[in-house]
Regions:
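Charged DNA-binding/catalytic regions of mobile-element recombinases
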Residues: 1-295
Length: 295
């Protein structure tokens, strides 16, 4: 008798295993196939419910089965409750959102907004940010304890004197941005305002993206001793962002380098900025955190 012809009786005797154990085949209860089939139907109908819910439904349908058995069959069949998905938001589909009113060239659309933080003594710090949506340049990164609408107008005037006047400027409906004096200023400069819908910050997506980087790379890593230090570090970070930091949406080119590669659009000088300050005053009063010419 060859090795492949050893009898089952001899193998079981050598291994000291009962022949009954060797020949055992698991018995499927008569109702198990029916229960599994019904479980599949219930899972398809109620995909967000678990095995306890399925057990309760089966009990209501007249199946005499305990919860532990349903749990075993649930695992055996590989049922899982899918993770709840967040409802997707439409990105900028409002009338003045970033999809319908997308920047087509440099100085076409600017966006601005505020970011808040505190210094180490707990006193508030407030940043005014202005960006060119096409080139992704940070045109201004001003920090103060607070801003009034006249302060916002002053910063914007200085940026316009250096950069020219944009065709549009996008913002939320914050009180500083909807002040009548500021609206009159923008109208006289020939700038169309793009106010996003209330409670829809994603419609100002470029500003939100910039703020995310600002928080991650500066605000979250620095504890500002006072306003003066916040101003100095903001100026340093803005320069790094514009001139050294590769931007993924620009093909990993720094915003200033990308802007320099573009053909210059016609310079638009609105009446209001020129009436607010002379070129000499602008040179003397430009904040260090405003963008410089040629970037």
């Amino acid at each position: 008798m060859g090795p492949d012809q050893i009898s089952e009786r001899r193998v079981c005797r050598v291994l000291e295993q009962p022949r009954g154990t060797q020949r055992y085949r698991a018995k499927v209860k008569d109702d198990e196939r029916t229960i599994i089939k019904r479980m599949h139907a219930l899972v398809r109908r109620h995909p967000r419910r678990g095995y306890r819910f399925v057990h309760a439904m089966l009990r209501d349908e007249g199946f005499h089965v305990n919860r532990k058995r349903i749990y075993r069959l649930w695992k055996k069949e590989g049922f899982k409750v899918p993770q709840k998905q967040r409802k997707k938001r439409s990105l900028g589909v409002g009338v003045n959102g970033i999809v319908r009113r997308r920047a087509q060239h440099k100085n076409d659309v600017w966006c601005w907004d505020f970011v808040h933080d505190r210094d180490e003594s707990g006193r508030p710090l407030k940043w005014l940010t202005i960006e060119d949506e096409f080139t992704r340049e940070s045109l201004a990164l001003e920090v103060e304890r607070s801003f009034k609408s006249c302060d916002v107008t002053e910063v914007l005037t200085q940026v316009m004197l250096i950069r020219g006047v944009p065709r549009h400027i996008r913002s939320d409906n914050g009180p500083e941005f909807i002040a009548r004096a500021l609206q009159n200023f923008l109208a006289s400069a020939g700038v169309e305002t793009l106010y996003i819908e209330p409670g829809a910050p994603w419609q100002n997506g470029y500003a939100e993206s910039f703020h995310s980087r600002l928080r991650d790379e500066l605000l979250a890593s620095e504890l500002f001793a006072d306003l003066r230090e916040a101003k100095a570090l903001s100026a340093w970070w803005r320069n790094e962002y514009n001139h050294r930091r590769p931007h993924s949406s620009l093909g990993y080119v720094a915003p200033a380098k990308f802007a320099a590669s573009l053909a210059e659009p016609p310079l638009r000088l609105g009446a209001a900025p020129l009436a607010c300050a002379t070129a000499q005053q602008a040179t003397d009063s430009v904040h260090p955190t405003l963008i410089t010419a040629g970037t």
